[in-house]
Amino acid sequence: RQMCIRDSGNAHAEGYTESPWLDKTCRTKQQIYLADEDTLIRISGYRTRQSHYIMYMAACIFSLGIIGLLSLWFPRWRLRYVYQEADFADAEFVVVENQWGDISKEAFMSVPFARPLKSVFPPTSRDPPCTYAEAQSMLHDAVPDEIRCGHDGEEIVDLLMFEYRYTRFLLHPPTGRFRTIREWRDGKWTSTDLMRQGISTELERERRVFFGLNVIDIAEKSSLDLLISEVLHPFYIFQIVSILLWSLDDYYYYAFCIATISIGSIVSTLFETKKTIARMREMNRFVCSVRVLRDSQWRYLDSSDLMPGDVFDAAEQSLTTVPADCILLSGDAIVNESMPVS
């Protein structure tokens, strides 16, 4: 598939315009423009062809793993021959592709919910934009009445979702397409007086299911996973084959030197990667104590327990960092290079 991009690396491009990606009724493919990241992504649902999977495993065994190694380096081959496209509701996983052609396989999370549909998808909810132009038009367009008033009595049994680069996508059952959690808005957020009431503990538990914790928790691969991914890199596979060939020709000194250098490089890369991930986790994970209005009572909670709709005391002396994106309901604050906000 070719991408027609006006400017290299620019998500404002007119590319990604061919159907069925822009078809709002398609349940196997979907294109979404992420305004916060200025990125276009394409989502496709897949499930396994059992007969093709059996043949693929047999080919891996008879080729001594060469077929499996090639499918690791060229994942599109495996997608084409082992899996088939499926509706999102019936898919085993999704593949996300950005405008630069990078693909990522993301697993589904299915969570028992048994709540009204409008608790996750409020009446103002709608499909995310497919292009930059559509995103700009949605900023000024009102939500259509058929979207605003539809599906009030419907309930969700299981909530189907996945995460891509720490953005959560939820499957909207009536349309069979994904919507981003960041576009969620409480229907009661119509005035500051209603927003000052905060939320209850029951509502916090309900929202925790699809929002998760208020913390950026960067996933950390195990040392074994990092080691395997490093060893299976094409460069090191070439080195391993070279060592075997030199050993067969009795060039043991050459083989030993190359093996020593390769092992040292792999171990060094492993430690450096682990160190970098640990540093990123430490920089991004922030938790502090916050004074929160919960069940009409003020109490101290961890900032990781904050949910959309919570009201917290920003004037608390111990609070030196704002723990979440928020709206100032009363008072004044100095932020962003001493710019006053009221």
PLM features: what roles do these ranges have?
Residues 2, 6-298, 307, 312, ...:
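Non-lumenal N-terminal regulatory segments of integral membrane proteins
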Residues 303-305:
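Eukaryotic mixed-charge, acidic/polar low-complexity intrinsically disordered regions
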